[in-house]
Amino acid sequence: MEERERGARSAGAGSPARPPSPRLDVSSDSFDPLLALYAPRLPPIPYPNAPCFNNVAEYESFLRTGVRGGGRGRGRARGAAAGSGVPAAPGPSGRTRRRPDAPAPDPERIQRLRRLMVAKEEGDGAAGAGRRGPGRSRKAPRNVLTRMPLHEGSPLGELHRCIREGVKVNVHIRTFKGLRGVCTGFLVAFDKFWNMALTDVDETYRKPVLGKAYERDSSLTLTRLFDRLKLQDSSKKEADSKSAVEDSTLSRYSQTSTWKLASVWGRADTGRGSHKRSRSVPSSLQASAREESRSELSGRTTRTDGSSVGGTFSRATTLSRGQSRKKKRKPKVDYQQVFTRHINQIFIRGENVLLVHLAQ
């Protein structure tokens, strides 16, 4: 193939120039582009300075705008426009280029248009400022305290009334199972999610039941809660009265014991006086009296020692048994116990709020 092409080229170079066939003539109607592509020599172009385009789309854009999209064509177009002295058409980049048939610009008209544009921009700025009100720096803050008055005419509006008038509210709180307790205090702030902040709060609550007692325990209600609280208060009063009675009995017993000790000391003093008086008694009688008193004291001490030893042994055994039993037994937990406490301030989440009503 290469040899044939070389031979054709050498033959063409040696032979005189022939007129191109109509199939290879670009200006003829019978032009065959496929044959021109595979021809050994490029067909002659009647316009040597014609621009070259990469594709058909670039050629179509050149026909619409008169400016080539590529850098080479753009530079060539600029150079051609500068050389010919004809102003170029406006390009796609937005640069102002006058067409050949466009009239000369009027400077007075341009000045009038600029003045109108400036006045319009100033008017639009004033209107926007009037609509927006104060600027961003002067914008009123938006927070929970500013949003609370906007809930007038709704249940949240009643909460805002309680804040203004200082009315106490009762907030019923729940756990994962049911009612937990009641918080009574003064409302300070709230939001649309029923999150609340209270001060000077008195809470009555019961700890949640866990473990196996959770399955057996019945649901807590307000009546059960406050009935249990009353029962605890009454039992506490009874325990206090019993402790007062025991304290009074102990004080009486201590008084009687002091009286007995005083009487014993008095008897001892009288015995000493009689002993002094009995010095005049004969020595034989004194010796017999001493022996009798010693025998009586020894008998009493043996009895008391035996009884004390037996008593201490029996008490020790009972105490050891009681301690072992206490160790085996688990401490009993009262799940129904109700607690009360006072809190200076508290935050309650809205998901834990069951009911809110005014305190009587």
UniProtKB/Swiss-Prot annotation:
Sorted alphabetically, which keywords does the UniProt record give?
Aicardi-Goutieres syndrome, Disease variant, Isopeptide bond, Methylation, mRNA processing, Nucleus, Phosphoprotein, Repeat, Ribonucleoprotein, RNA-binding, Ubl conjugation
Cross-link for Glycyl lysine isopeptide (Lys-Gly) (interchain with G-Cter in SUMO2), residue positions: K120
List of residues that carry Phosphoserine: S15, S21, S154, S280
Q: Where is the Sm domain?
A: 154-229
| One GO MF term attached to the UniProt entry | U7 snRNA binding
Q: Residue ranges under compositional bias (Low complexity)?
A: 78-94
InterPro entries the record matches: Lsm11 (IPR039267), Lsm11_M (IPR034109), LSM_dom_sf (IPR010920), Sm (IPR047575), Sm_dom_euk/arc (IPR001163)
Q: List the disulfide bonds.
A: none
Positions of the region Disordered?
A: 1-29, 68-143, 268-333
Effect listed in the UniProt record for changing G211S: In AGS8; impaired histone 3'-end pre-mRNA processing, leading to defects in chromatin structure; promoting CGAS-dependent activation of the type I interferon pathway
Renumbered to this chain, region (SM 2) spans 343-356
- Which Gene Ontology BP annotations are present? mRNA 3'-end processing by stem-loop binding and cleavage; positive regulation of G1/S transition of mitotic cell cycle; regulation of chromatin organization
Q: Where is this region: SM 1?
A: 171-204
Query: Modified residue Omega-N-methylarginine is at which positions?
Result: R41
Subunit architecture: Component of the heptameric ring U7 snRNP complex, or U7 Sm protein core complex, at least composed of LSM10, LSM11, SNRPB, SNRPD3, SNRPE, SNRPF, SNRPG and U7 snRNA. Formation of the U7 snRNP is an ATP-dependent process mediated by a specialized SMN complex containing at least the Sm protein core complex and additionally, the U7-specific LSM10 and LSM11 proteins. Identified in a histone pre-mRNA complex, at least composed of ERI1, LSM11, SLBP, SNRPB, SYNCRIP and YBX1. Interacts (via the Sm domains) with CLNS1A. Interacts with SMN and ZNF473. Interacts with PRMT5 and WDR77.
Quote the entry's note on domains: The C-terminal SM 1 domain is both necessary for the binding to the Sm-binding site of U7 snRNA and U7 snRNP assembly. The N-terminal domain is essential for histone pre-mRNA cleavage. Amino acids 63-82 are sufficient to interact with ZNF473.
Q: Which disease is it linked to?
A: Aicardi-Goutieres syndrome 8: A form of Aicardi-Goutieres syndrome, a genetically heterogeneous disease characterized by cerebral atrophy, leukoencephalopathy, intracranial calcifications, chronic cerebrospinal fluid (CSF) lymphocytosis, increased CSF alpha-interferon, and negative serologic investigations for common prenatal infection. Clinical features as thrombocytopenia, hepatosplenomegaly and elevated hepatic transaminases along with intermittent fever may erroneously suggest an infective process.
Name the chain's protein: U7 snRNA-associated Sm-like protein LSm11
Gene, per the UniProt record: LSM11
